[in-house]
């Protein structure tokens, strides 16, 4: 491809709203243009990269035995109402009405549609197993779209859905997709980790995310420094405390604490360590009641763990001060488990405390030297805290370390979550009707492009991993418009490279060499060849790899050998 026949839309200016390097570089390299908040046009250069990623995804899905189809973007409200997600999905679901006042939505995902297909088309166990996938535009009405295509409202996604007769078959399909995802991200040249994850709005019982490691990632990846354990911090388990709780020493005592509202203030007032106090958080129950969650003073609540607790509302909702005062008689800064008039759940680490401090459920008063069972019944105990870097890994091997990650894919074991609600069944070999066992598997194709840039760039621009590069070779002539020899040599080499199967971008613009070099570095083409009069005099071409700082001279007759 010659630049004169291509749309090269590089710019020097960085948009004011572009914070991440990937967003800045995708705009400057002419890959994207913003249409509206969270909506982007993929220009020809960007589309080439997007299609490269989609091609790798498609090849590996086909290799894994999945079958491609294409479902509508617009979906009937009735399907989402049937699954129970019409209201539960929240404001990210863009709801619309047609001219006949029928409700629809722009699909953020396609579990309902594929389950509807399955219940209509699948009748017998003999048709199983099956796995369908599509690569298609999705829409989620993000409250605050940001970071370019990293968190946009419209995006390209690969979503797949497996159907099996039983749980064993579903697990086998899950493992097959898990392995396919590993191959996809390995082929794309990304540094990634597969981590245990929460199932979120999709649902199901078991899930992994695929996280591209990058300092700007929104997710915290937790991993052991001595084992294969890895999880999103939302899912990371805190190891249960070891040993028996020691016996109490001091007598419980109420102290006046005027103005004390936080653990730090209590620690300063009572001269105690934060880890010797407990904090009490009030959340809403699933039947309008209130429930207290009690943690050690130096720990933070893991909202995802909490909202999966029996009796706790999903999604998690904190009670406001008015509700707390009506139920307990004090403000949020004076709460504690002693004589608490509502049910409470204690974190496992807080349950090990001896002679601890807590609110007295009376404004401006706290208890010190409180002990479980002696002064207050322990009640329910669960793992509800966020893990802390340096914690012992839950598998007992090594310590937990943290890294930042960008989620580019997730796989789920759905079981019969959708098939049961939508009555998707098949008849087994005994003639018995059974609910289909499902899995679903997503890859953010457009987000993967941005994540790759976050891992692969420098001060000059993008450094594409080879499988994602829009072109393989940049051919840059020096003063071609003044030199017949340079033009002729370029024409000959360009045709040889094309005939050899390489994707070449020939910069045939009437521009200064520095401008052309800067543009080729910015758009990140892996290999650059420079042809000049002085080089031709010596029978050489200058070769430079994008990821290298040094150029080298290559014989004009042996240029193709560089790429073999």
Swiss-Prot record:
Specify the signal sequence span.
Answer: none
- Xref: Pfam families: HGTP_anticodon, tRNA-synt_2b, tRNA_edit
The answer to whether the entry has keyword ATP-binding is yes
A GO cellular component entry from the record: cytosol
Q: Which InterPro entries match?
A: aa-tRNA-synt_IIb (IPR002314), aa-tRNA-synth_II (IPR006195), aa-tRNA-synth_II/BPL/LPL (IPR045864), Anticodon-bd (IPR004154), Anticodon-bd_dom_sf (IPR036621), Pro-tRNA-ligase_IIa (IPR002316), Pro-tRNA-synth_IIa_bac-type (IPR004500), Pro-tRNA-Synthase_IIa_type1 (IPR023717)
Kindly list the biological process annotations in GO that this record carries. prolyl-tRNA aminoacylation
Which CDD domains does the entry link to?
ProRS-INS, ProRS_anticodon_short, ProRS_core_prok
Kindly state the subunit structure of this protein: Homodimer.
What the protein does comes down to:
Catalyzes the attachment of proline to tRNA(Pro) in a two-step reaction: proline is first activated by ATP to form Pro-AMP and then transferred to the acceptor end of tRNA(Pro). As ProRS can inadvertently accommodate and process non-cognate amino acids such as alanine and cysteine, to avoid such errors it has two additional distinct editing activities against alanine. One activity is designated as 'pretransfer' editing and involves the tRNA(Pro)-independent hydrolysis of activated Ala-AMP.
PANTHER family found in the cross-reference section: MITOCHONDRIAL RIBOSOME PROTEIN L39/PROLYL-TRNA LIGASE FAMILY MEMBER, PROLINE--TRNA LIGASE
Q: Provide the family line.
A: Belongs to the class-II aminoacyl-tRNA synthetase family. ProS type 1 subfamily.
By what name is this protein known? Proline--tRNA ligase
Write the lineage as a comma-separated list. Bacteria, Pseudomonadati, Pseudomonadota, Gammaproteobacteria, Legionellales
